Swiss-Prot record:
Enzyme type, top EC level: oxidoreductase
Domain of life of the organism encoding this protein: Archaea
Name used for this protein in its record: Sulfhydrogenase 1 subunit gamma
Chain sites annotated for binding [2Fe-2S] cluster: 253, 258, 261, 273
Assembly, per entry: Heterotetramer of alpha, beta, gamma and delta subunits. The nickel-containing alpha and delta subunits constitute the hydrogenase activity. The beta and gamma subunits (flavin-containing dimer) constitute the sulfur reductase activity.
Function comment: Part of a bifunctional enzyme complex that functions as an NADPH-dependent hydrogen-evolving hydrogenase with sulfur reducing activity. May play a role in hydrogen cycling during fermentative growth. Activity not exhibited with NAD. The beta and gamma subunits form the sulfur reducing component that catalyzes the cytoplasmic production of hydrogen sulfide in the presence of elemental sulfur. Not active in the presence of sodium sulfate, sodium sulfite, sodium thiosulfate or cysteine.
Activity-pH behavior: Optimum pH is 8.4 for sulfur reductase activity at 80 degrees Celsius.
Protein activity control: Stimulated by rubredoxin at pH 7.6 but not ferredoxin.
C-alpha cells in the first residue's frame, strides 16, 4: 500500500531516500567542490526545508553514503547546495558527478542553529577551513532576512589563500554588505605570498561591528582553534550562553542509531548527529570528548 505523499516527506520520515539531480558543479579549491542539487519530485522540492546548521546523508548507490552540512540558505526553495571535500572513497566518487547526474539524499538531520532565537541580535560568524561551509548557510539566511538581525560580521579564514572557501563570493558581496552594516573579514594564517589580511580568527574579533552583550556567535573550524577563540570571545565580553559551535565529527548514520558519534562519559554524553551538530559553549565545556 502506498503511503500518502505528505507522510513520505523527508522531514517526517528520517529513513526516506529521495532522488536529487545535480544542476551545477563548481570547483572551489583543489579538494573542495560546490554542488547545486534539485529534488526531482517538484512537490517534494516545494515542501522540503531545513535549518542553517543541519546536514543530509548523501548516498551513492553501490558505493556508500556520507554526512554533509547544507551550505545554502533555506529561503531558496527547491534547491540546496553542498560543499564537499574529496577525502575518502565516497567523496571521491561524488567529485566525479556532472550536471544531469542523480544521487540520493535523506534528511535533513541534526538540530541546526537557533536562528529564530537570534532575531534582534547582532551576529558574529567565525569560520576556518571547511568550517566556512555550514556558516555560509547561516550568513546567506541572515542576508535573506536582513531586517531580523542587527550588525553582522563574518570572519572567514584558512591556512593558505588557495584554500579560502567562497573567497570570491564574499569579496563580491563586500560593498553591498558594508552598506547594510555587514562586515566581511577574510584572512590566511600561513601563506607568505597572500596580499590580503593575515592572522588567526581570534585576532579579528576586536574588529567586529557587533555588540558583545547582544551578539549570537557561531563558530566552525578545526577543533584546535576553539580554545583560543573561546578565550578571546570571553575576554571581549561576549556572553557564553550566546556562543554556539557546529561539529562535523564521527557522524555516520545521521540519526543516533549506530553510536559512532557518541562522545562523553556515563554521566555526560552526546550524539553529535542527533544532539548536535550544533552545540552551546556550555555543552562543549561539560562534555568530555566533544572537541577531541
Amino acid at each position: 500500500m502506498m503511503l500518502p505523499k505528505e507522510i513520505m516527506m523527508p522531514n517526517d520520515n528520517p529513513y526516506a531516500l529521495h532522488r536529487v539531480k545535480v544542476l551545477k558543479v563548481y570547483s572551489l579549491t583543489e579538494t573542495e567542490k560546490l554542488f547545486l542539487f534539485r529534488f526531482e519530485d517538484p512537490e517534494l522540492a516545494e515542501k522540503w526545508t531545513f535549518k542553517p546548521g543541519q546536514f543530509v546523508q548523501l548516498t551513492i548507490p553501490g558505493v556508500g553514503e556520507v554526512p554533509i552540512s547544507i551550505c545554502s540558505s533555506p529561503m531558496r526553495k527547491g534547491f540546496f547546495e553542498l560543499c564537499i571535500r574529496k577525502a575518502g572513497r565516497v567523496t571521491t566518487v561524488v567529485h566525479r558527478l556532472k550536471p544531469g547526474d542523480t544521487v540520493l539524499v535523506r534528511g535533513p538531520y541534526g538540530n541546526g542553529f537557533p536562528v529564530d532565537e537570534w532575531e534582534g541580535m547582532d551576529l558574529l560568524l567565525i569560520a576556518a577551513g571547511l568550517g566556512t561551509a555550514p556558516l555560509r548557510s547561516v550568513f546567506l539566511y541572515a542576508m535573506d532576512n536582513r531586517w531580523k538581525y542587527g550588525n553582522i560580521t563574518f570572519i572567514n579564514t584558512a591556512r593558505y589563500g588557495k584554500d579560502l572557501l567562497f573567497y570570491k563570493e564574499l569579496e563580491a558581496m563586500k560593498d553591498l554588505a558594508e552598506a547594510e552594516n555587514v562586515k566581511i573579514i577574510q584572512s590566511v594564517t600561513r601563506d607568505p605570498n597572500w596580499p590580503g589580511l593575515k592572522g588567526r580568527p581570534q585576532q579579528f574579533i576586536v574588529e567586529a561591528n557587533t555588540n558583545p552583550k547582544n551578539t549570537a556567535v557561531a563558530i566552525c573550524g578545526p577543533p584546535r582553534m576553539y580554545k583560543s577563540v573561546f578565550e578571546a570571545l570571553i575576554n571581549y565580553g561576549y556572553r557564553p550562553e550566546n556562543i554556539f559551535v557546529t561539529l562535523e565529527r564521527r557522524m555516520k548514520c545521521g540519526i543516533g542509531k549506530c553510536g559512532h558519534c557518541n562522545v562523553g562519559t556515563s554521566t555526560s554524553w552526546k550524539y553529535i548527529c542527533k544532539d548536535g551538530p550544533v552545540f552551546t559553549y556550555f555543552d562543549i565545556v561539560s562534555t568530555p570528548g566533544l572537541l577531541d
